[in-house]
């Protein structure tokens, strides 16, 4: 998504993911301004449709398609966390979960505290959060393969999750009635059912058809850390943190996979942990 100025200069384009994430942030901002804030009467973004740009393909190239994603060393991971502690603390917990459990970005954001068993050190992955451009909503749906899976984790992530829970309880006390709670709404369209995500603070009336859900990855005010804002955080890292020029959230999943395989885990076991449809996908990471 780039272009050429009238004077002939070519502007560097933005990636598709960047455009969609930026659009999602605008959608949410304007929607919030309409309701509950009532600052404007309508959402101007509801009339915006993003253009699709066809990817150019060299039909006669002999080159094989390569992902090119490299695993992150533990030293670089620790450097990333230190950077985020200063620049973007809400992004830390989802990145830690993905690094130690190999979840996709939507699965990470979709985790609830009910999905986590700290005593047995395992988590259940059964939902994912994504932005639906057609509906202009964040929706809660199934995982990519539409299957429930269980992932074990160790002492490090256990302590991280316990600390996060304590911090969230502390934030709830500090924010008081301004602390946000998260909800989903069941929507029926023709023969389909989907679930929209919403968040409201304690001063706002909760509609009767909203059901509360206790997500794990929260912002300080209690609202959900969404995949779109996580994507923006990762792009910021790739631009500003030395050595992370090609960083993206999915790289954490690659790292988790690489660590398991290099430590002798059976490919079939890793496949099940990751929720891949076949073992060849796992081995190509």
Give, region by region, the residue ranges found by the protein language model:
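N-terminal core-binding DNA-recognition domain of tyrosine site-specific recombinases/integrases
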Residues: 1-32, 38, 223-229, 246-251
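Conserved tyrosine-mediated DNA breakage-rejoining catalytic core shared by Y-recombinases
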Residues: 50-53, 111-208
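Short, basic (Lys/Arg/His-rich) helix/loop patches that form interaction surfaces
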Residues: 8, 12, 82-91, 101, ...
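Catalytic-site neighborhood detector that most strongly recognizes the C-terminal catalytic loop/helix
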Residues: 129-131, 255, 274-285
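A short, basic/aromatic helix-end/turn motif that makes direct DNA contacts
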Residues: 110-116, 271-277, 285
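Generic recognition of well-ordered alpha-helical segments
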Residues: 24, 28, 155, 159, ...
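Basic, Lys/Arg- and aromatic-enriched nucleic-acid-binding interface segment
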Residues: 10-16, 20-24, 39-40, 46-105, ...
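Short, conserved phosphate-binding/catalytic loop or strand-edge motifs used
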Residues: 1-6, 50-53, 257
């Amino acid at each position: 998504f780039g272009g050429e100025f009238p004077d002939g200069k070519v502007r560097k384009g933005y990636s598709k993911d960047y455009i969609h994430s930026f659009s999602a942030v605008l959608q949410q901002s304007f929607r919030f301004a309409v309701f509950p804030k009532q600052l404007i009467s309508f959402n101007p973004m509801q009339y915006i449709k993003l253009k699709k740009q066809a990817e150019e393909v060299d039909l006669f190239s002999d080159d094989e398609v390569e992902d090119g994603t490299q695993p992150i060393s533990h030293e670089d991971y620790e450097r990333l966390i230190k950077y985020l502690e200063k620049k973007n603390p809400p992004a830390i917990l989802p990145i830690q979960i993905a690094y130690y459990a190999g979840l996709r970005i939507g699965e990470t954001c979709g985790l609830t505290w009910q999905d986590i068993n700290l005593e047995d050190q395992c988590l259940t992955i059964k939902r994912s959060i994504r932005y639906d451009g057609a509906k202009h909503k964040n929706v809660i749906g199934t995982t990519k393969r539409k299957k429930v899976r269980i992932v074990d984790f160790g002492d490090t992530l256990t302590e991280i999750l316990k600390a996060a829970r304590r911090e969230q309880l502390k934030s709830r006390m500090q924010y008081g009635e301004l602390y946000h709670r998260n909800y989903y709404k069941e929507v029926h369209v023709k023969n389909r059912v989907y679930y929209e995500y919403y968040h409201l603070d304690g001063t706002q009336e909760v509609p009767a058809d909203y059901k509360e859900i206790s997500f794990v990855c929260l912002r300080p005010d209690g609202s959900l850390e969404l995949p779109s804002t996580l994507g923006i955080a990762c792009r910021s890292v790739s631009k500003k943190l030395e050595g992370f020029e090609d960083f993206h959230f999915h790289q954490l999943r690659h790292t988790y996979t690489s660590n398991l395989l290099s430590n002798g885990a059976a490919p079939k076991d890793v496949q099940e942990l990751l929720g891949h449809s076949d073992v060849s996908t796992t081995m190509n990471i």
